[in-house]
């Protein structure tokens, strides 16, 4: 009873609920982002394939380094049924576009704007980027916080 009004307790309770919501075994929360063409794309549009969901930004050097691994995975496994949805939090749209071109990121791209960014980051409990999830064809989260060789190995095993 005493904890019910305690701010620290409520923050921890909310964080635990968020982490449970986006843990492996849970359905990936659906959201929309704006595409390079100015349309909207939803995570639900990618059902039917395995998806690497990659939250990043052009100014984030660890994100840019990770995109090299994601590109290798995409090139190796896209034909087998793997897709990538990279979702940027960039404020500078030109920097976002340039990074995509410079890094050869030919897969699905989206950018979050304003309140939608805050909403999606809260939905997924994102406190830092890169933040990566792997989602199965039914929309269920099957991997989280995998990067580099661990992400490559995990995704390769999906098609063994």
Walk through the language-model features, giving the residues of each.
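Active-site acidic short loop of glycosyltransferases
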Residues: 47-49, 79, 105, 126
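Conserved redox-active cysteine motifs that mediate thiol-disulfide chemistry
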Residues: 47-48, 55-72
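Alpha/beta-hydrolase fold active-site loops
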Residues: 50-51, 130
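Thiol/disulfide oxidoreductase modules built on the thioredoxin-like
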Residues: 103-105, 112-158
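Conserved hydrophobic packing residues within short motifs/helices of P-loop NTPase cores
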Residues: 53, 85-87, 110, 133
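Oxidative protein folding and maturation machinery
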Residues: 1-41
């Amino acid at each position: 009873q005493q904890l019910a009004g305690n701010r620290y307790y409520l923050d921890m309770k909310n964080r635990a609920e968020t982490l449970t919501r986006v843990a492996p075994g849970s359905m990936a929360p659906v959201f929309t982002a704006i595409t390079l063409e100015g349309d909207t794309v939803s995570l639900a549009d990618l059902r039917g394939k395995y998806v690497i969901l990659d939250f990043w930004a052009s100014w984030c050097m660890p994100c840019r380094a990770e995109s090299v691994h994601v590109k290798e995975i995409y090139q190796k496994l896209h034909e087998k049924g793997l897709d990538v949805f990279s979702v940027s939090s960039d404020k500078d749209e030109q920097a976002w576009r340039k990074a995509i071109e410079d890094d050869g990121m030919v897969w699905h791209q989206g950018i979050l704007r304003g309140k939608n960014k805050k909403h999606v980051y809260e939905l997924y409990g994102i406190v830092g980027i890169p933040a990566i999830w792997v989602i199965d064809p039914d929309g269920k989260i099957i991997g989280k916080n995998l990067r580099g060789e661990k992400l490559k190995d995990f995704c390769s095993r999906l098609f063994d």
